[in-house]
């Protein structure tokens, strides 16, 4: 949120001068982004800001997004913003950008396989950046799901029965049993007709996750 606040303040200052910020202004946020990525206990796989087209004086579409590369090196995320290209990346259509823009609220999207070429499931957390009530972009972070799952497991593992946390579309975020793998579709596990099955909305508006408690005893991880 500190990076989002800085981007908003910078946009506000430039607007007061009758100008727009440039890509150079956003590049100055790299030190803070580095610190977030390289924290000793960080689950963050990539993070930065993505701007609404037309917000910069020198670029139509722009993102200042960095990710963890090989050997712990922080590297920039590079995407193709040439609208005439077959590989054009239209982030305006992505849910992590469109939903904060349309709702004005924080969102959590995923899990889905990342864009980084590592075939890793990630969750994208994003929040809208507004300047004087006007949407100018989002600040976000990609969280490696296998790391985030460990945090959730500390609570799930205390439950005797099979329990899992699922996303809005029904994908497994975390489970206390070897019967489920993160990223699995679990619609049938949410069958409210199953005797003893409980589905509890977790109440987090940004994520729309549910806790599913099934009537069967959990199968311990590593069990045959």
Where are these regions (language model features)?
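Juxtamembrane extracytoplasmic/periplasmic/luminal helical "stalk" adjacent to the first N-terminal
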Residues: 1-24, 105, 121-122
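Soluble sensory domains of the PAS superfamily and closely related sensory modules
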Residues: 40-42, 92-107, 191-207
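Extracellular/periplasmic ligand-sensing ectodomains of membrane signal-transduction proteins
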Residues: 42-103, 173-180
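Conserved beta-strands of PAS-like sensory domains
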Residues: 118-152, 214, 221-224
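Solvent-exposed, extracytoplasmic
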Residues: 142-175
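Extracellular/periplasmic juxtamembrane segments that couple receptor/chemosensory ectodomains to their
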Residues: 179-224
């Amino acid at each position: 949120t500190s990076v989002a606040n800085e981007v908003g303040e910078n946009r506000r200052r430039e607007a007061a001068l009758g100008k727009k910020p440039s890509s150079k202004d956003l590049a100055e946020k790299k030190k803070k982004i580095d610190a977030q990525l390289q924290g000793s206990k960080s689950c963050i796989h990539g993070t930065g800001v993505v701007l609404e087209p037309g917000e910069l004086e020198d670029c139509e579409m722009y993102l200042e997004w960095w990710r963890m590369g090989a050997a712990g090196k922080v590297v920039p995320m590079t995407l193709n913003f040439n609208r005439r290209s077959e590989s054009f990346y239209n982030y305006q259509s992505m849910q992590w950008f469109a939903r904060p823009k349309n709702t004005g609220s924080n969102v959590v999207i995923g899990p889905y396989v990342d864009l980084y070429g590592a075939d890793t499931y990630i969750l994208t957390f994003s929040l809208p950046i507004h300047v004087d009530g006007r949407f100018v972009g989002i600040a976000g972070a990609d969280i490696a799901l296998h790391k985030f799952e460990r945090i959730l497991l500390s609570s799930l593992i205390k439950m005797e029965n099979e329990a899992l946390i699922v996303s809005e579309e029904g994908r497994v975020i975390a489970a206390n049993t070897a019967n489920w793998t993160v990223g699995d579709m679990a619609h049938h596990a949410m069958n409210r007709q199953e005797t003893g099955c409980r589905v509890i909305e977790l109440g987090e508006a940004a994520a729309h996750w549910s806790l599913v408690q099934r009537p069967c005893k959990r199968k311990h991880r590593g069990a045959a």
